[in-house]
Amino acid sequence: MVAKRQVSVKSIKRKARKAQKAITGRAKEFSYRGHSLEELQNMELNELLPLLPARARRSYSRQMNHEQEKLYEKLLGDKENIKTHVRDLIVLPQFVGKTIELYNGNSYIKFEIKPEMIGHYLGEFALTRKEVKHSGPGVGATRSSKFLPLK
């Protein structure tokens, strides 16, 4: 006879929350460190810096290089689709909703900046390496692979 596993109330509630989240989408409105997106977009850069992570604060406390400044000005403008090689610019709330084509060393990866990306580098969203997908062994790789039919 197999004993039944007891299910805790906690796990039932967790599953119910997960199912509800899947139905409704985002559970609550976006906020970054207690501030809504509209508040963040209305802030000046010097008001916003204390909210960013230490690495981003340090990066913005130093001056931006020429390429970063050019991209920053383009992102603040009205242009929709922007192509760039600059991967080390940190996403600010003013950039949300813009579409960027970022170079990954081989091709341009197109993505839209979302509120969840605030405080991250642009380069994090266009990966430079492909995920390795291994297939079967090649001819001569093992002793048994000699007898595999060639394509």
Curated annotation (Swiss-Prot):
- Keyword Ribonucleoprotein among UniProt keywords: yes
Keyword Phosphoprotein in record = no
**Pfam families, per the entry:** Ribosomal_S19
Q: Which GO terms describe its cellular component?
A: cytosolic small ribosomal subunit
Could you tell me which PROSITE patterns the record lists for this protein? RIBOSOMAL_S19
Q: List the disulfide bonds.
A: none
Which Gene Ontology terms cover its molecular function?
rRNA binding; structural constituent of ribosome
Please give the biological process terms from Gene Ontology that the record holds: ribosomal small subunit assembly; translation
**Any idea which UniProt keywords this protein has?**
Ribonucleoprotein, Ribosomal protein, RNA-binding, rRNA-binding
Family assignment from sequence similarity: Belongs to the universal ribosomal protein uS19 family.
Which PANTHER family does this UniProt record tie to the protein? RIBOSOMAL PROTEIN S19P FAMILY MEMBER, SMALL RIBOSOMAL SUBUNIT PROTEIN US19
Q: What does this protein do?
A: Protein S19 forms a complex with S13 that binds strongly to the 16S ribosomal RNA.
The name this protein goes by in its record: Small ribosomal subunit protein uS19
Q: Which organism is it from?
A: Picrophilus torridus (strain ATCC 700027 / DSM 9790 / JCM 10055 / NBRC 100828 / KAW 2/3)
